[in-house]
Amino acid sequence: MKNLYLLLCLPFVALFFSCSTDVDLYANYREVPIIYGLLDARADTNFIKITRAFYAEGDATLSAPNPDSSNYPGKLDARLVEYCNGDSIREIILDTVTIYNKQQGVFYAPAQKLYYTTEPLPNNSKTQKYSYKLKVALPDRLLTTHADLVGNDSYDVQSLAVNFSKEYFNTVPREFLFRPAINAGFYEVDMTFTFLEQRTPDGDSVPRTMHWYIGRLNDFDLSSNMDMNCYLFYYRPEDFYAKLQEFIGGDTAIAGLKRYITDYPVEVIITAGGEELRQYVHNNDPSLGFSQGDNAFSLIDGGYGVFSSRMTARRRVRLGGETVPELVAMRNWGFKFIGGREDHQ
């Protein structure tokens, strides 16, 4: 299952072959401009990847995994035009930076040239809705694309606890509330469960975190089943136990092993993605590359890729109901509740 965490990083997914810095090697190849950018009003820096690849007539294999061919020379004129309720407010000129912590992938690594801005982006409100046009001047064309800004100050997680009590096994799913984000096309929901693990009596307690992907939820569907002014997602307690059993390695008791549960062990993470991103994910299989035969979906006028927006809401919550005593009762799992205490001896 595709996780939004990966989608929101959005590497250009395609098949590549070796290439040389010799430009003549690309004489028979057509240049493909590519843009990936997701604006986030809660981020202190927003990055946009502006790059290119090459392919030949009838050849679905793209080339350009090294910086000499993938990067456009110099610094392009790239800017964001900010709109409020449809009126142009300001232009933000993007600067460039090279990052050196990119993991190995289809593009060259570890260094990547990115365009960025540290200009604060305003939040949407009931009376003011923001959007952005990205304009990139290439030597032979102008790339343009548009995105509505996702999110607002009130977008957040509402419920204060999750309840994995066994009395709800194989019954109706449990519900969890959050406030919607303006201009969101969909949401992806994750939970994490963190506990301390001590494998020997004199050993250190090491944090361990189980990640649980709940799913992708369409804004249109959520809006048709609201609780007051909140959206709801659902989870099943039996799925939590199954995930946790797999994560800790089964039911077999390990001599001397202890696991400690604190007051707020679960974090709920809800990421809202823009409508442009929803359309891109819906229309493109990220495992495929672009070719003339693919007719790949793109909202970039003059290029490929996606330009959209996102915002993440998160909250640490308690374990409700009988969840804690029931976990402690699973003796082979070795759990003990310590609340907010640092001393768990």
Predicted regions and their residues:
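Positively charged n-region of N-terminal signal peptides that target proteins for export
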Residues: 1-4, 21
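Sec-dependent N-terminal signal peptides
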Residues: 6-10
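C-terminal motif of bacterial Sec signal peptides marking the signal peptidase cleavage site
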Residues: 15-18
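A sequence/structural signal for flexible, mid-protein segments enriched
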Residues: 20-345
